[in-house]
Curated annotation (Swiss-Prot):
One of its GO terms (molecular function) is structural constituent of ribosome. GO terms for cellular component: cytosolic small ribosomal subunit. This is Small ribosomal subunit protein uS2. Residues 1-22, 42-57, 65-78 have a biased composition (Acidic residues). It holds the Pfam family Ribosomal_S2. Transmembrane segments: none annotated. Disulfide bonds: none annotated. PROSITE patterns: RIBOSOMAL_S2_1. Signal peptide: none annotated.
């Protein structure tokens, strides 16, 4: 089925990669702040066909489910409330899309209007779809499954790393290595090589090497750590993947699709929502927008993990 903007005032987004389905023109238009009011007033409902089936099975050949968790009914509170308000989305600049000349036609149903050659995203749909993505992330965590966080664009790196580590999930933020999931065993060999160099350093083996050879080993380790350090503890394929920018991380999207791994992703107006299980139509370039979406998903993961811990404690008490 998947650069740089200011943090405070949402602006027209720089393109990381050209969209294959749309013509390209230079980004030279400033966003009109009146788009905020227009996006806030919309009463469009999220199309039912975009909402993923909550009861759909999680993709198989990844983390093993220990059978601890059974499907649960959504609470009435979850059904009637939203994790993020329209005002919060507006403040984060989540409604600002790209230049109309750079859009992907498949995003048309998520676009509220056009203003000054900029597409404005329908935040009513963004709000609902973010809720659905968060509930999916919560379910994965509650069942003891791993979600790989992926965001290699500069403004996403620190945010993705911080939140992934906060909830104990693997992450890739330096660059996406082709075959990270489809050639996972080779990736694991590289991780074992990194760990081998670390052992050599601890036991003094590196000190016995010639200075030049030792330096080469240390540089090799540094490179491996930068690229693979975030997934060193990921012993199996993830059960799901969260992607910040499907346009940039197109290889990750392709690999997940090939393996049947569910995708949760931020999709901007230049992106392709096709084959994304849980698309979140939002600005994927603004720091504030990336932070809002990623922190919301992280909170959901932590809720799932907490419910899992509580359930295990209840079982222990019942067995005592």
């Amino acid at each position: 089925m998947a650069d740089e903007t200011t943090t405070d005032t949402p602006d027209v987004q720089d393109e990381d990669a050209p969209d294959e389905d749309a013509p390209q023109t230079p980004d030279d238009t400033a966003s009109d702040s009146t788009g905020e009011a227009a996006a806030a007033d919309t009463d469009a409902d999220a199309p039912d066909e975009n909402a993923p089936d909550e009861d759909a099975p999680d993709a198989a050949p990844q983390d093993k489910d220990d059978g601890d968790d059974a499907p649960e009914e959504s609470s009435s509170e979850e059904e009637t409330s939203h994790r993020v308000t329209i005002e919060e989305l507006l403040k984060a600049g989540a409604h600002f899309g790209h230049l109309t000349s750079r859009w992907n036609p498949r995003m048309e149903k998520y676009i509220f209007m056009e203003r000054n050659n900029i597409h404005i995203i329908d935040l009513m749909q963004s709000q609902v779809l973010l809720d659905e993505a968060a509930e999916a992330a919560k379910r994965f965590a509650r069942r003891g499954k791993k979600i790989l966080f992926a965001g290699t664009k500069k403004q996403a790196e620190d945010i993705v790393r911080e939140h992934a580590e906060e909830c104990g999930m693997p992450h890739m933020v330096d660059r996406w290595l082709g075959g990270t999931m489809t050639n996972f065993q080779t990736i694991r060999k590289s991780i074992r090589r990194m760990e081998e160099i670390e052992r050599m350093d601890r036991d003094g083996t590196l000190d016995k090497l010639k200075k030049k050879e030792k330096l080469m080993r240390l540089r090799e380790h540094e490179k491996l750590e930068e690229t693979l350090g975030g997934i060193r503890d990921m012993a199996n394929l993830p059960s799901a993947i969260y992607i910040v920018d499907v346009q940039r991380e197109d290889i990750a999207v392709s690999e997940a699709n090939n393996l049947g791994i569910p995708i949760i992703a931020m999709v901007d107006t230049n992106g392709n929502p096709k084959n994304i299980d849980y698309p979140i139509p939002v600005n994927d370039d603004a720091l504030s927008s990336i932070e809002l979406v990623t922190s919301t998903l992280t909170d959901a993961v932590q809720e799932g993990l907490q419910e899992r811990r509580m359930k295990k404690e209840e079982k222990k008490k019942a067995a005592a």
